[in-house]
Structure formats: structure tokens, C-alpha cells
Amino acid sequence: MDELKNIIRDIPDFPKKGIIFKDITTLLADAASYQRMVDLLSHRYIGKKIDKVVGVEARGFIIGAALAYKLGAGIVLVRKPGKLPSETFKKSYELEYGTDTLEIHTDAIEKGERVLIADDLLATGGTMAAVVDMVSSMGAELVECCFMAELEFLNGKNKLPADKVFSLLKF
């Protein structure tokens, strides 16, 4: 895993002073590293009968679509308001300073479907907790929330079901 971790570059003071941003674009741009990351994540879920992979806007689409393809599952998009063309289910959630809202098509997941939620990075856990609530309220069975990377010091997994979180890389 160290070879994958080492490809992710640190950008100091982005998006604001005092933050060290984990830039995953370097890993995504390296074909061998991207393939290895997708293979490692997908291997965990082979045989788990995943019906849908939910990708969280925007970088979760990159990981979610690749996983859905490898697992023979459908891909479902969770987006910011006003980006989906049909009827949506909305979920607002608290941020450090204010609120945000996510949307999913109301017909994207059927009751009882086995769902894997994918995103690039687990930080504070607020966004993923909202997505878990959305998927659960639609009647889906949550298999797991999977992440390419996790910033452990932010304790984001404390906001998620304890046995339903997997992060490939930990910082």
C-alpha cells in the first residue's frame, strides 16, 4: 500500500491556510496505480452480490463507476442539488459552518438491493453519513462504505456504522 500512498501528493495550504490537501489526481493519472487501487477495492467485494454502487459527487464517481463495472453492478449518482433531471430524494446535513444538501433519484435503488457506497476520501464523515441515511431510507441493504483513502485523525468513521467502513489507504 505504501507505493499507492506515496503517489498521492500533499498540497500545503489548500484550500485554505493550515490544511494539507491530499491530491489523489496523481494516483488517478498513473494507469498502473489506478488499476491497482480499483483491483484492490473490487477484490474485497467479489462474491458479495452487490446490486448497486453509489458514487458520491464528484470524485466518488471515478471510484464508484470503476467498482460497479468490475462487480457487474449498476452505478447510482449522489449529486448536489439541481444536477439530476428526474424526481429526487433530498438530504440536508450539517457542515462545520452551515448546511449542505445532496440528492439521489427516487427510483435509483429498489428496496432490498445490496448497496456499496464509494467515495475517494473519508474526512469528517458528514457527507457519507448523509448518503448512508439516504440509501437506508430507500430500503437498501448497506454492504459497506468504501474509500480510497481516509484521514484517520479526523475520526470520520465515528459518524458511520462501525462495521460498515473500509478504507484502502490511511493517513
UniProtKB/Swiss-Prot annotation:
Matching InterPro entries: Ade_phspho_trans, PRibTrfase_dom, PRTase-like, UPRTase/APRTase
Record's catalysed reaction(s): AMP + diphosphate = 5-phospho-alpha-D-ribose 1-diphosphate + adenine
GO molecular-function terms, A-Z: adenine binding; adenine phosphoribosyltransferase activity; AMP binding
SUPFAM superfamilies to which the protein is assigned, alphabetical: PRTase-like (SSF53271)
This enzyme's EC code(s): 2.4.2.7
Glycosyltransferase among keywords: yes
CDD domains: PRTases_typeI
GO cellular component: cytoplasm
Alphabetically ordered keywords of this record: Cytoplasm, Glycosyltransferase, Purine salvage, Transferase
Family: Belongs to the purine/pyrimidine phosphoribosyltransferase family.
Self-association and partners: Homodimer.
Function: Catalyzes a salvage reaction resulting in the formation of AMP, that is energically less costly than de novo synthesis.
Full protein name: Adenine phosphoribosyltransferase
